[in-house]
Amino acid sequence: GTALSASRLLADIPDPILVWRDAGGAVAWWMLASGTVSGAGFAQATPDWTVVATGDSAASGRQDLYWRNATLGAGYLWRLDGAAVTGTHDLGVLGPQWRIERTGDFNGDGRTDLLFRRDDGLLYLWHMDGGTVLSQGAIGQLGADWQAAGALDTDGDGRDEIVFFNAATREIWLWFLDGFAATA
C-alpha cells in the first residue's frame, strides 16, 4: 500500500489557506506559502453561511473559498487573489440534504472538483471549471460510518483518488475514479 503523511497531503496544495470565522459572521483568511503568510483577507457574512471547503477552482494556482448555507442547501464560490475576492459564482441550491464532502482534482484538469454527499450516503461528483459545472454524475453510495477523509493523487496519473475511512471498523478504502466510475 501507499503510506500517506501530512507533508505528502500538504504537498498537493499549491498555497494552503487558513480560514477563521467568529459567531457574528466575521471571516478572515490567510494564504500560506512556504510556511509564511503571503496574503490575507477579511469579509462579513451572515451566520447561516459557512466556508466548507477550499480549492483552486480555475487552475490559477490560488485557493478559493466554497460557501454553504446549510438551511437552504445553497452553495457559493468566492474566487480569491490573496486578500481580494476577484469573482463570485452562485453554485445553486441542491437542498439541505446535500453537503460538500470533499474537494479534489478528480478528472486531472488542474481545477478543483466537488464531491457531494446526500444524507442517505449517495456520492455525487461535479467536474468544475470555476463556477461552471462541466459534467456531473453519481459515483456510489456508502453507509453512515464511512467518511471521505482525503483526496490525493496516489498513482501519479494527475487525478485525485478519494480516501474513505470507517471510524467503527478502522478500515480505509481508496477509490480510483475514471470519469464517474469508481474502483477500490
Regions found by a protein language model. Give the residues of each.
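Trp/Gly-enriched beta-strand/coil motifs that build multi-repeat beta-propeller-like domains
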Residues: 1-184
